[in-house]
Amino acid sequence: MILISDATLRDGNHAIRHQLSAAQIHAYARAADEAGIDVVEVGHGNGLGGSSCLLGQTPIGDRLMLETARAALRTSRLGVHFIPGLGKAADISLALEIGVDVVRVATHCTEANVSARFIEQTRAAGRTAFGVLMMSHMAPPDALLAQAKLMERYGAQAVVLMDSAGYSTPSLVRAKVERLVDGLDIDVGFHAHNNLGLAVANSLVALEAGARIVDACVKGFGAGAGNTQLETLVAAMEREGHDTRTTFERVMTLARGTETFLNPKTPHIQPANIASGLYGLFSGYVPHIQKAAQEFGVNEFELYKRLAERKLVAGQEDIIIEEASRLARERDVQRATGGVRVRELSA
């Protein structure tokens, strides 16, 4: 049976600058529970401890968000996203105290070693720990397997590949998921973003390659161009004969019901979303990049290229300002030197 992890109340928070209310969390968690969703993930878009001036502040704290969801769930498990460095061990302790069932410990795809103490902390409490490798497009299959094996060694009961930038095509997904499935003794999962319009297709390919966990959001509600759309995914999974706890009819009832209390808009794929996917940048960076390009008067798409050269990962918003400022200075020098590009002068 395929496990569906619903990130609407976590990744969806990115789409509204992390402003979900307690009432919305309670209503959606209850509806998702009734729809037979396996795991309902809740929190700031960047996970436990993510609320900040840099990343965006939530109107309510982690405790109230999790307590609200916990009270609404009966059969669905409560999950959280945790990035070491943004969150602390105390944040996991709080989540476990409240009754979180699944802790997804997420690291950059080449930094799994920082997940050890948090996976161990979760397992010691008798709860489920998943490892998550973010920005998975930035590492080849063998490197991802080596990192996933570390998480497995630390006690992770599954490893999820996160296509955080919406960069991947089906062939890339197949190669990476197959490598992990063949090399691990634990389940493999996949989390897609829709920057190139491939989220559902990539999720189906991941399942064909042996993944047993897929992430999705109602109406695709999520960062950038959105996540895998839950209703579309479940319909396609039924067509392909995948067994789940839910059905298309149940998730359609869930989606329609959200119009009264959540009203998530299915994201449209904008040129900026395509650019962030093409250049492999975290989907949540789009509004920050657009703002910086406007403030410094530089070309938005040139800024995407520059940031891609820096190989940005989540949590490096300050570098967006740095590169926009550098582009502006280069433009000013170019004008002063009669059109000679700064990079030509330094070559």
UniProtKB/Swiss-Prot annotation:
InterPro entries: 2-IPM_HCS-like, 4OH_2_O-val_aldolase, Aldolase_TIM, DmpG_comm, DRE_TIM_HOA, PYR_CT. The active site is at residue 14. The record marks 10 as: Transition state stabilizer. It comes from Burkholderia pseudomallei (strain 1710b). PANTHER family: 2-ISOPROPYLMALATE SYNTHASE 1, CHLOROPLASTIC-RELATED, HOMOCITRATE SYNTHASE-RELATED. Substrate binds at residues 10-11, 164, 191. It catalyses: (S)-4-hydroxy-2-oxopentanoate = acetaldehyde + pyruvate. This is 4-hydroxy-2-oxovalerate aldolase. SUPFAM superfamilies: Aldolase, post-HMGL domain-like. Mn(2+) binds at residues 11, 191, 193. Pfam families: DmpG_comm (PF07836), HMGL-like (PF00682). Keywords: Aromatic hydrocarbons catabolism, Lyase, Manganese, Metal-binding. NCBIfam families: 4OH_2_O_val_ald, PRK08195.1. Residues 2-252 form the Pyruvate carboxyltransferase domain. GO terms for biological process: catabolic process; L-leucine biosynthetic process. Its EC number is 4.1.3.39. Signal peptide: none annotated.
